[in-house]
Structure formats: C-alpha cells, structure tokens
C-alpha cells in the first residue's frame, strides 16, 4: 500500500469518528497553541526590551558610581551626581563620538487656566529628540535657535495634553510651569514599548530650564559613537575626561547599553524556554490521549487487521498504517494549534502593548514536534496491531 493510500485511509478514519478525533486532538491543539503563544510573545517582548534598553545603535551611558569614601561622606552622592556644560563640551571633542545627548528632569506644577497637574519637565540639548526617537504628533520640534536662545517653548506628552487641554488643541497656548510661562509648540506621539510609560511630561531646551528655573547641570548623559569599534576607546576617554573634570579617580564610568540588552535578552530567552517547556507538558498529555484512542482503534479494528493479514499484508504494512494514522491525528491537531497560537499571540500582544514575533522556525518546530508526538505515542498501538495473529484476529467478535 502506497504512502498516499495510507494517508487517505487515515483521513477516512479520522472523519469517520469526528467527535472522538476532535477530543483526541484537543491536547495537541492546546499544547501547540500555548507553546506558540508563549514563544511568540516572549520573543516579541525580548526584542522590544532589548530595543528599549539599547536605544540607538552604538550607544553608551555615562553614570556615576561613588567610591566607599565618597559614600561615607555623602550617602546621597550617586543621586546628586551631575554633568556640567563643560563636561558636555569636552565630550563633544572626543574622537569617535558622534553625538552627546544630555538631559535633566525635575517634577514641577503645570497650570493652564483652572487646570493643574504635576508634570516631569525635561531640559534637553539638541539631538535628544532624534536619538531617543521622540516623534511629533502635531506642531513642530525645537529649532537650533530654540536651544541656543533658550526660548520659552515646550513639547508635551499626550497625557499632559489630555490633562490640561482635554480635546482642545494646545498648540500656541501658554502653560505656566512653576510660575513661568511656556508656549506649547508640539505634542508628542504616544511612545509604545515594554519600558515606555504614559507620563505627564514636557520637554524644553536646557538653556530655557537654566534661565527660568536655575538648573545648572545635566543629570543624564549618553554618547552615540561613530561605530562599534569606537565604543571601548571613546567610552574610556569620555569617562577619564569627566573624572578629571570632577577630581575623581574612577567614579564616572561608561555602560554599554547594547551589551546589557544582550545579557537581558539571554535571560528572557531562558525564561521563555522554561515557560514554553511547561506549556509543552500538555503536548505529552495530548500524546497519551492519542495513544489511548489508537489502542481503542486497534481493538475495534481487530477483524479488519486479521482480514488484511490473511490477504497478504505484512507486519510492516500494518505498523505503517497505524503509525500514519497516529501522525495524521497529531499533525492536524498541530496545524490547528498553530492557527490558534497565531490568534492568541495577536490577542495577548494587543492587550500587553508589544508585538509578537512568530518565526518560521517556531512554526516548523510546532509541525515537526506534533508529528514526533504522533510517532512516539503511536508506536505502541501500531506495534500491537502489527503483532496480532491473523487467525485470532479473525475470531475476534
């Protein structure tokens, strides 16, 4: 009997017992579907987490790690560490550094007419918007003159626009920040991402924050280098420059965000694998269900097996027939599970707010594993059918 004929007979058997076949495949469907959902959402979350942490390519973060002596004299040394404009100027002159992005943040009261809210006001330098992928929903972004002159203009988040203006356009309106007037020139697009939060925020030129609120230093500095080859040398020189400026030995250091993102990616990948493996237990349960039903099928078709053997069917042919029937059952369940997994991943991603990532390797793995389950758990029933004595089988009632 040819392979196609065996597959046709297997499909006929499945269709002849629709309800039993559906119930048998249920464990496989749930198992494959749950693994697809876990892996797809896990990989999507991992990718977004890595992107959120690493930011633009070839980026390092400057941070302050006080020594034991510094902490002993000032327990708040890390929180109070800053970067001066002189630091920024020196960093821009280091070979290999493409852009120096600096900012500082303070919590302030924002008021528009009778509406008032607490907002985070971020004083930024040029390049911050672009490097951090902040896009304008309406209005305009900052000009070079805004940064140089410290114009009293600001760009606000959608949450802040909603809190102060509701459905009215904020463009051109004046918001009072700690008693200082700031004209709204733009509204940001909502930022989506695993580490993105919908906050009430305003971005203003650093020079404006300096002149209006007395802010003199930056609290955060990141460096975008020309190429990956420059990360180590430029980062080392940058840390040395800032340490020299502040009279510290090794308190200011650099952090390669891409390396951190890669490390976190490995951890999330391990977690996804563990959770996926737990979800895969239902596949084993489904496999046991397939084996039980196939054993029942062998018992029900004992006379059929006896007739086939008396007509010349070999043990190998009987074994192949029942193995293919088992594989067809699990394969159909696997394909349905993949479809449900796609839908489930899309639903979870829509609720969680990050994309799912379903690779062809995952799909192929689901198909192959389903077939493997069919072979493993179909072997016992198929072997039992193949070993039946034709005379005893023909006597079976």
Curated annotation (Swiss-Prot):
Pfam families: FtsX, MacB_PCD. One of its GO terms (cellular component) is plasma membrane. It comes from the Bacteria. Induction: Expressed in exponential-phase cells. The chain crosses the membrane at residues 22-42, 270-290, 327-347, 362-382. It is found in: Cell membrane; Membrane raft. It is a multi-pass membrane protein. Keywords: Cell membrane, Membrane, Transmembrane, Transmembrane helix, Transport. One of its GO terms (molecular function) is starch binding. Belongs to the ABC-4 integral membrane protein family. Part of a complex composed of YknX, YknY and YknZ. The complex interacts with YknW. Part of an unusual four-component transporter, which is required for protection against the killing factor SdpC (sporulation-delaying protein). This is Uncharacterized ABC transporter permease YknZ. It comes from Bacillus subtilis (strain 168).
């Amino acid at each position: 009997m040819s392979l196609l004929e065996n597959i046709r007979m297997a499909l006929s058997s499945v269709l002849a017992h629709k309800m039993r076949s559906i119930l048998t495949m249920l464990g496989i469907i749930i198992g494959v579907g749950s693994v697809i959902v876990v892996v797809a959402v896990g990989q999507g979350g991992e990718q977004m987490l890595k992107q959120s942490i690493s930011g633009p390519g070839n980026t390092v973060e400057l941070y302050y790690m006080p020594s034991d002596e510094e902490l002993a004299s000032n327990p708040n040394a890390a929180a109070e560490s800053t970067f001066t404009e002189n630091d920024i100027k020196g960093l821009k002159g280091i070979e290999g550094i493409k852009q120096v992005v600096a900012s500082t943040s303070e919590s302030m009261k924002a008021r528009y007419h009778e509406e008032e809210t607490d907002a985070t006001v971020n004083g930024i330098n040029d390049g911050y918007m672009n490097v951090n992928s902040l896009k304008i929903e309406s209005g305009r972004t900052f000009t070079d003159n805004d940064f140089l002159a410290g114009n009293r203009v600001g760009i606000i988040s959608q949450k802040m626009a909603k809190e102060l203006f509701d459905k009215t356009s904020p463009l051109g309106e004046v918001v009072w920040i700690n008693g200082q007037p700031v004209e709204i020139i733009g509204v940001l697009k909502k930022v989506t991402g695993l580490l993105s939060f919908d906050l009430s925020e305003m971005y203003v030129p650093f020079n404006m924050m300096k002149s209006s609120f007395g802010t003199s230093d930056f609290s955060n500095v990141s460096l975008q280098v020309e190429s990956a080859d420059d990360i180590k040398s430029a980062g080392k020189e940058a840390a040395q420059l800032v340490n020299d400026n502040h009279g510290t030995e090794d308190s200011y250091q650099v952090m390669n965000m891409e390396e951190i993102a890669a490390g976190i990616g490995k951890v999330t990948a391990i977690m996804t694998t563990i959770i996926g493996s737990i979800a895969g237990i239902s596949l084993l349960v489904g496999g046991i269900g397939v084996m039980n039903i196939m054993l029942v099928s062998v018992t029900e078709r004992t006379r059929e097996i006896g007739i086939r053997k008396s007509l010349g069917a070999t043990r190998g042919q009987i074994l192949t027939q029942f193995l293919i029937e088992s594989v067809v059952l699990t394969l159909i369940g696997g394909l349905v599970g993949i479809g449900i997994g796609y839908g489930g991943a899309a639903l979870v991603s829509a609720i969680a707010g990050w994309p799912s990532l379903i690779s062809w390797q995952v799909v192929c793995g689901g198909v192959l594993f389903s077939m493997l389950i069919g072979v493993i758990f179909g072997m016992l029933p198929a072997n039992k059918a193949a070993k039946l004595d034709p005379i005893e089988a023909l006597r079976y009632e």
